[in-house]
Amino acid sequence: MTEEAVALLRTIPLFRQMGLAELYLLTGIGMEEQVPAGTTLGVENEPVTDLWVILEGRVRITSPATGEGESFLEGPAVWGAAALVEPHTSFGTGVTATECRMLRIPAVDLRELAVRNPRLGVRLYQEFATHIFVRLQRLIEESASRNAGRPTSQAPRPARPAARRRDIPELHSPPADALSLLQRVPVLEHLQPDQLRLLFAIGVERHLAPGTLLGRGGEPLDVLWIILEGEVEIDSPLTRGSSIIAGPESWGTASLVPPHTPNGTAVTVTECRALLLRAEDVRALIEQSPRLGVDLYLALSTNVFRRIRVLTDAAGRPLR
């Protein structure tokens, strides 16, 4: 791989946090190829076996499942990043529109490299999580735009007293069942028991009264809430509706990726037992334990993919 090709990699957002040595590790598991025009790189809703790094050339992407139609990727760019997370299926069909100079990286090898070299892995998955969060935000906004002016299917709810933050005494003795509850939180599903203990150690367990505000949609958020027990209502002006999440669950993962703003406002409905994690403390822990960061951002991205599936299914379109 030439220095010029590595320099092109550094301009791609997915790799922008990586140092030169990490980029050479990445290119070491890939193969540079000249790909003829008209070559199918992957088909929507089918397994993605390779991450294609487009160094030069143009790729046509069709994404009927989300209503995004046809678009083009101009090198330097990547196609096939869905290979990074389960279920490893394509977000659209990619076909080269011109002859392309590409680096083909086997997806299995890339995922294994992220585990073997966790500092590389955490930078890769953090950027990917940011990308997929932006994609989810766009889909939510498009869904809201399509539904503008339509009546909601929800019955009116009685007025609720204004939510406010409450001063809750911190609990310094974690209950014995806390780790077993953490293991059931979807965004923590890839973490091992020792990693969960590290995470618990930097958090503060709280008992929250009904009506406690956890965060407002569209406003900066600097905490991640792990709801161990209880229910939280999420109101989203974009979707013109609300939903209830019940522990063990999480809210506030947006605090871990730019722009650090959640889509909805979260308020406790019942008394809740929760673990408060400050985003800056989580990031500091990831710096000390990058493998934890790989597993956390991997689970976070996987859960965002699931939300995208729900949105596309609700819109009555097949999932790509």
Regions found by a protein language model. Give the residues of each.
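Cytosolic regulatory regions built on CNB/CRP/Popeye-like sensor folds
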Residues: 1-320
